[in-house]
Amino acid sequence: MDRIFNMDNKFFTFMSRVADLIILNLLFLLCCIPIVTIGPAVTALYYVTMKMVRNEESYIARSFFKSFKENFKQGVAIWMMALVLILLEFMDFFIMKQLSGGIYTVVKYGLLVIALLLAMILQYVFPLLAKFYNTVKNTLRNALLMSLRHLPYTILMLLINIAPIIAMLLNTMIFSYGILAYFLLGFSTLAFANSFFLVKIFDKYIPQDENAEEEKDADDWTIEGLREELETSSEGAASDDTAASADQEVTEDDTTEQ
């Protein structure tokens, strides 16, 4: 009987996690209402879910608003740039319908490639902003580099995000329940699922010095290996030009973990 009501058993642990995801989802939706704040909201969402994956989370609301406040300016800047590009993509797709023949095909596939690259960058840019201190420019560059270097994980995360939407569009009943699920815990659950891959990826860029880990708080770590990791990402598989390109994309200043 004691095991049933033990707060450490799997059932209570699971229900506690579900409750946290519901609270986090509601906070995320609340902060997305002004539209312009979607960037900081996504950043804060991933800040909390990555801590959940590491079992480092404390108070959900406190952690969420801490990241929301700290990354507000950069989050808004990145989101507004992304929003402009998304709107331009939609406009181009409408204009494309007026074309015909070979030009139509070239433009169509060109826009699809751009849309895919944008989706890949957005998959990483806000989690990167949540995890590391850097400039907007370098955060965007590193998001592109990581999305290409870790392409299998990138594709998997995109599929995780897209699959529920496709299922909802194919079935009206799924659509109805899907809308409810998204409002209840959909966004936080997807971010939580993606965070398992993101934590694994980001750990490659965090020094594993045990002494440093004991002496410093995680928020104070400096990413010493970011440049080296990106420079050698193509070793044995890609050309020297790719590695040189990665060297140019990373800043001379170290990136610092938040």
Regions from the PLM with identified roles:
Residues 1-111, 121-124, 128-258:
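Helix-coil boundary and N-terminal low-complexity module in membrane systems
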